[in-house]
Amino acid sequence: MNNNQGRFVFPDTWFGPLLGEFEEVLDAYDTDEISETGYINKLRRLAQQEPDFIDIHAHLAYAFLEQNAPRKALNAALKGLAAGNRLIPESFSGEIIWMHPENRPYLRALYATILANVHLQRHQDAVMLTDKILAYNPEDNQGARWLLGSELLRTGDHERAFSVLKKHADEFSPYWYELGLLHFLNGEHVKAATAFRHGFATNTYIAEMLCGNLHPFPLAVRHNFSGSLDTAEDYYATYSPLWGQYPEALLFVNWLYN
């Protein structure tokens, strides 16, 4: 620990040749030399050989998330998180920042745990863990702040949700839609309309999906991450259930957009 910042230290003798084997598995998967199933099986075998190798569990968790298996992802991520937590002194209250490569396996495992809870709709757990990762790594290289507002809204903490959504809407288009929904639920229809129109301007695909077109045609323009079809699809797949509870909000969006 230095200047209230923690850094994991892994002696070379801890994982030995397993580190090289792990990197070979990652390279083989990245270059399509092995299938997703082969990749997962190899990672599982390595995890059995060395249960304290945090990054193996983290990568397993992301592989399960890609397979839309959030329970398996959560199980893998929690194993990595537990291995890391055993190395953190109980009295530690500082930062664990991404800038130090040794910290990244732990932060990857923590973020995978958040994503798994998001997909399992365990919103309170997702908020608690997101607060934790943002305290550890305020620079937020992984983008946890782009989950926090939506998760807070779904826990019913509207006041804090508004604060987070308002702060980050300019950098993340789905937050304009979330902000609009929050205003609509509060009966603030003019503010809702303003937020939704910001959303239409920054990511039109989300509006298309909320209006019933679940497969919008990609526009022939270059989008940044926030305005992309991928972002819209991820948002709709993850957060549309709350919209489904308020058909009048969907009608309002449809009326504004069309």
Identify the residue ranges that each predicted region occupies.
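Long, ordered, amphipathic alpha-helical scaffolds
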Residues: 2-4, 181-258
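Flexible helix-coil transition and linker loops at the boundaries of alpha-helical arrays
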Residues: 10, 45-49, 81-102, 134-136
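Alpha-helical segment of the N-proximal tetratricopeptide repeat
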Residues: 15-49, 111-119
